[in-house]
A protein has these predicted regions:
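C-terminal alpha-helical interaction appendages
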Residues: 12, 40-142
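Membrane topogenic helices and adjacent juxtamembrane segments
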Residues: 1-45, 138-139
């Protein structure tokens, strides 16, 4: 699973760099509001609930935390929004945790796909049928 996590980190950071370059900071409040919309927020909470009790090794946790901090700082330096930075870094943690736990949660795969499509997830997400691992491996080959 280390390879898949490496690929996730690489694609997530690369996509986020492009997202932040293209982001109109005047839209941050709208993005935050859309993420607080019931269906998005509830789906996020449900996905978190599925991995909340999962146990990861110290190395896995440290690896996720390191990238999460990098994502937070990168986002904050471009947006000056601690709320958006927290949301995006927590999204990375959620996606990485589901990947390491090898779960099959189509909403989390859709969350990841939205980032890889260089968009900040909000509102309703386009459904992705592959597992998260399958999705990342397809991206790694492209």
């Amino acid at each position: 699973m280390a390879y898949e996590l490496e690929q996730l980190q690489r694609f997530f950071i690369s996509s986020l760099e492009q997202i932040l370059t293209d982001l109109d900071v005047a839209l941050i409040d709208e993005i935050l509001d859309d993420r607080d919309f019931t269906s998005f927020s509830q789906s996020w909470e449900d996905a978190f609930g599925h991995i909340e009790e999962k146990k990861f090794t110290v190395d896995e946790k440290n690896n996720i935390d390191k990238t999460r901090q990098e994502v937070f700082m990168m986002t904050f330096s471009k947006t000056n929004s601690s709320d958006l930075s927290a949301y995006i870094s927590e999204d990375f943690e959620l996606i990485a945790s589901h990947l390491l736990a090898n779960t099959n949660n189509t909403w989390v795969t859709s969350l990841c796909a939205t980032y890889f499509q260089k968009k900040i997830p909000q509102g309703e997400l386009r459904s992705i049928k592959e597992t998260l691992k399958e999705f990342i491996l397809v991206w790694a080959k492209s």
